[in-house]
Amino acid sequence: MQHDLFEHDPAIRQLIGHIDNIPAPELESRWPRSVVDLIDVLENELKRQNVSNPRELARKQAVALSCFLGGRQFYIPCGDTILTALRDDLLYCQFNGRNMEELRRQYRLSQPQIYQIIARQRKLHTRRHQPDLFSPETPK
């Protein structure tokens, strides 16, 4: 992953930096509805994280994304798979060996489902902290 995606295009960097000089309503009224919707989503997440100037940052992020992905067909999968992976990791972190029933009720899963999740997560967490000695790949 590049740290400065637009380092070779100073014009884009300059334009993204100039966004703050244009009144938001004027700017957003000229953008496609899908970009404004993306700004709303990004702004809400930035607010949730207590980031200052969330709307301004969200606009800059949306412009950066549209410069990078604009004009391409780009598939963003439904959040279900991502949310399930996050839920499974959280469940594993909450599991203490004695709270199976509590987790079963909280996540509305069966006991066998929870055991399967814990087994999968244990493997993932072990690999995260103890790299495979026989694997040719080096951890990143």
UniProtKB/Swiss-Prot annotation:
Q: Where in the cell is it found?
A: Host cytoplasm
Cofactor section? Mg(2+)
Tell what triggers its expression. Expressed in the intermediate phase of the viral replicative cycle.
GO MF annotations, alphabetized: DNA binding; metal ion binding
Q: Tell me what the record says results from Q113P.
A: Loss of DNA-binding activity
- S-S bonds: none
Nucleus as UniProt keyword = no
Question: Locate the bZIP domain: which residues?
Answer: 69-90
Give the UniProt keywords, A-Z: Activator, DNA-binding, Host cytoplasm, Magnesium, Metal-binding, Transcription, Transcription regulation
The record's annotation in Gene3D superfamilies points to: Homeodomain-like
Name the DNA-binding segment ranges: 99-119
Q: Keyword Oxidoreductase, does the record have it?
A: no
Domain comment, in the record's words? Answer: The helix-turn-helix (HTH) motif is involved in DNA-binding. The leucine zipper (bZIP) domain is involved in dimerization.
Assembly, in brief, is: Homodimer.
- Member of which family? Belongs to the c/mor transcriptional regulatory family.
The protein's name is: Late transcription activator C
